[in-house]
Amino acid sequence: MPVTAQQVELIPLAIYTLFAVGLIGILLLAARYLGSGKETSEKHIPFESGMVPTGNARHASQVPFYLIAIFFIVFDVEGAFILAWATSWDLLGIPGLVHITLFITVLLLGLVWLWMKGGLDWGPSAMRARGKRS
């Protein structure tokens, strides 16, 4: 079976992949055989920093992390749209500028509305204020 030019171009990638996998395997085996396998009581506590822990490691967090994730997704999509608009500016012209301006304006109005509603207040005082309102 003849070797094509595309297969020849993939040979360096295959060599690099084999080298990387081999190096990872060697390092994992070295860590397994050279490291001490002693089980100590300190390895089973939540903080393995050499200090005796005080308090509970499993405390409830006050920051609503789901909001951070939603904000990240919204502004990440906004960045993708703006990047796509910027790369095709020559084709879109003024109508594209109007569309992206409206898009950013709607997002900013949504951010202002969220701010005014208290959606960005995450501290303990905000949690107490929400508890009093309900």
UniProtKB/Swiss-Prot annotation:
Keyword tags: Cell inner membrane, Cell membrane, Membrane, NAD, Quinone, Translocase, Transmembrane, Transmembrane helix, Transport, Ubiquinone
Reaction it catalyzes: a quinone + NADH + 5 H(+)(in) = a quinol + NAD(+) + 4 H(+)(out)
GO molecular function: NADH dehydrogenase (ubiquinone) activity; NADH:ubiquinone reductase (non-electrogenic) activity; quinone binding
Keyword match Calcium: no
Compartments where located: Cell inner membrane
Statement: the UniProt record of this protein carries the keyword Cell wall biogenesis/degradation: no
Disulfide pattern: none
Membrane topology: Multi-pass membrane protein
Residue stretches spanning the membrane: 10-30, 65-85, 94-114
EC number(s) on file: 7.1.1.-
InterPro entries, sorted: NAD(P)H_OxRDtase_bac/plastid, NADH_UbQ/plastoQ_OxRdtase_su3, NDAH_ubi_oxred_su3_sf
Superkingdom to which the source organism belongs: Bacteria
GO cellular component: NADH dehydrogenase complex; plasma membrane
Quaternary structure (record): NDH-1 is composed of 14 different subunits. Subunits NuoA, H, J, K, L, M, N constitute the membrane sector of the complex.
Family matches, as HAMAP family: NDH1_NuoA (MF_01394)
Biological role stated in the UniProt entry: NDH-1 shuttles electrons from NADH, via FMN and iron-sulfur (Fe-S) centers, to quinones in the respiratory chain. The immediate electron acceptor for the enzyme in this species is believed to be ubiquinone. Couples the redox reaction to proton translocation (for every two electrons transferred, four hydrogen ions are translocated across the cytoplasmic membrane), and thus conserves the redox energy in a proton gradient.
Family: Belongs to the complex I subunit 3 family.
Name of this chain's protein: NADH-quinone oxidoreductase subunit A 1
Organism: Citrifermentans bemidjiense (strain ATCC BAA-1014 / DSM 16622 / JCM 12645 / Bem)
Lineage: Bacteria, Pseudomonadati, Thermodesulfobacteriota, Desulfuromonadia, Geobacterales
